[in-house]
Amino acid sequence: VKSKMLAAFTAVTLVALLVAGCATPAAEPEPTTPPPAAEATATPEPEPEPEMGTTYKIGFGPDVTGGGANLGEPQRNWAEIMKERLEESGGIVGPDGVVHEVEIIVGDSESNPDVAASLARRYVDEDEVVALIMGSVTPISLAIAEVATEAEVPYISMASSLAIIADPDTGEMRPWVFKVAQSNGDVAQWQVERLTDLGVNSVCYMYENTGYGKDCYNNSSAALTDAGMENMFEGAFERTDTEFPQVPAIEAAGCDAVVIGAIPPGAANAHLAIRTALPDIPIIHGHGVCTTDFITAGGDAVESAEMPCSAVIIAEDIAADNPAKATWMDFKDAYEDYTGEPVSTFGGHAYDALYWVIEALETLPEGLSLAEQRAAVRDYIENNITDWPGTAGIFKLAPDDHYGLDYTSFTWFKVEGQKFVPFPEEEW
């Protein structure tokens, strides 16, 4: 048994050895190659905080209350929009890379010259503003112009009279005073052209008893007289009047057309009284009525009223190649989004004035004294606001012209279907 087990074991062993001899030898394991070492990444340097410089302050004081409120409220609205824009942008950057916050200090001139002058002095002396943007109407602006001139602070008025920027005796520009609203002299040129086209030989003139109304009358009556039209009647009224004893005199005068120089509500109330008495007589206005307040106050009575206005109120209909199109759309869209109301040409005056100052501030290096800042802003506006597309037109300021517009900044309109509708000369 033992010999059989040994023979079996031997046989199994021989077979195992034969199998092992025929097998392929196992491959030697290759050494493991370590992964390449990661390249050292430099820790990024944090971007340096921008250098912050002087905070610039602008004194902004439209007539939010009182007789000029229809003009001042839209102007205040734009100032609030501008404050939001400046906050979102983090301020402005000077030519040296220094960042400056811009603070717009909004007040109310209250349509009162004394209040306006006091507010201007506070802005200048206590708030240390670099510029003033104030005055929605002429008498307020004239009061502020005196303060600005004495303090040597650049001042931009949002009212229309040329007397604001030019000495009435010499005609010379007031060095520190500018304005953005179209002038009544340019309005008068449009009125002459329209009334001439209508074949008018005589006019009756109604105007509000304010600096604005008197400036309207002075410019229009002179231009109409020069054009050979007889002034049959002139009469003044208060801006808040609702009764107009002048109307019977207009009826008796027998004039061919009536011209009104006023803003709402007086302009609408006077129009209503005249239209009621003389349903067929042509009635034309100045640019003080280029606001929906005029249509709201006058209703159906102001249908067919005509006036010159800035085309910003129909910005979306203006050709794309118009150099002011982008400005008009920027203003119109932002204003209507913010207020939920139709765009106002008066708010546009605030747009133009604020961007003049902002553009000037962007050129100031850090380190200037307040007096140097004020002088530099004045110089920039006088010399660099040229071919500048604003809401009121293309401005071309110069040392001898602190206004920079002409009558071509207007488009002739009429009220139709309770809207302002363009009424170009080819349709007259």
What do the predicted segments below correspond to?
Residues 70-77, 92-168, 180, 236-243, ...:
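Beta-alpha junction/loop-to-helix N-cap segments that form part of ligand/metal-binding clefts
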Residues 274-351, 363, 420-428:
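Extracellular/periplasmic periplasmic-binding protein-like sensory domains
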Residues 115-118, 163-164, 174-278, 349:
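Extracellular/periplasmic Venus flytrap/periplasmic-binding protein
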Residues 123-136, 154-158, 204-207, 254-264, ...:
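Periplasmic-binding protein-like
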Residues 17, 21-49:
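Ser/Thr-rich, Proline-interspersed low-complexity disordered segments
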Residues 51, 56, 78-104, 226-229:
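Signal peptide-proximal N-terminal region
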Residues 52, 59-82, 107-113, 136-137, ...:
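Extracytoplasmic "Venus flytrap"
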Residues 334-347, 358-422:
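Segments of small-molecule ligand-sensing domains
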